[in-house]
């Protein structure tokens, strides 16, 4: 369930890159309706052509999700001895593996999904920002989702999503730490690419 919400919230909240005046909270709030509307309007088309859905998801995630920085945090101490090429390969493989397994779950995102920004908290002298939000669904309890952003040369980019208190980075850090105690990073990356290795929800 975690990954379904992570992908849906990343895509729904972070669809387009921010302009200079956009704060992370404003970006999350402003873009949610537009992307949820697109998913709802093109649901039948995406179901009929999974490749089109995959291309759409990749395009949206690419604009604001800092997959390499996120991958470094997931790898933690294992990133210290890895080359830039190895980290990039791992980041790409992990993202593709998750999209391959859970991308279709985005088709379950309903058009009446909403978002409410509760707070923005600057971190590390303003270099990072935590956005506390809630995903709202009619007749159902709201789901707390926090986004962690880092400021880069390209603007604000998200590197972690925390759904109901469960962090994407911390969840996979624990799983990959266990794997990397017995395998090399290249072996783990290859397993993700080939589909012989999958991470749990």
Placement of each model-derived feature along the sequence:
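Low-complexity, intrinsically disordered terminal/linker segments enriched in charged
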Residues: 160-201
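Early exported N-terminus immediately downstream of N-terminal targeting peptides
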Residues: 22-102
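Bacterial N-terminal signal peptides that target proteins for export
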Residues: 1-7
């Amino acid at each position: 369930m975690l990954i379904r919400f992570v992908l849906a919230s990343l895509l729904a909240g972070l669809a387009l890159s921010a302009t200079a005046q956009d704060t992370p909270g404003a970006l999350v709030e402003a873009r949610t309706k537009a992307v949820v509307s697109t998913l709802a309007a093109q649901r039948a088309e995406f179901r009929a052509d999974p490749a089109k859905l995959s291309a759409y998801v990749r395009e949206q995630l690419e604009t604001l999700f800092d997959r390499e920085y996120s991958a470094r945090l997931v790898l933690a101490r294992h990133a210290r001895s890895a080359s830039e090429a190895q980290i990039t390969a791992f980041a790409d493989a992990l993202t593709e593996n998750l999209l391959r397994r859970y991308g279709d779950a985005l088709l379950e995102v309903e058009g009446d999904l909403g978002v409410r920004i509760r707070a923005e908290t600057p971190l590390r002298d303003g270099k990072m920002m935590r956005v506390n939000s809630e995903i709202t669904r009619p007749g159902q309890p709201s789901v707390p989702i926090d986004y962690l952003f880092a400021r880069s040369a390209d603007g604000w980019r998200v590197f972690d999503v925390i759904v109901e208190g469960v962090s994407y980075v911390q969840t996979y850090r624990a799983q990959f730490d266990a794997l990397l105690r017995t395998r090399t990073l290249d072996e783990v990356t290859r397993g993700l690419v080939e589909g012989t290795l999958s991470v749990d929800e």
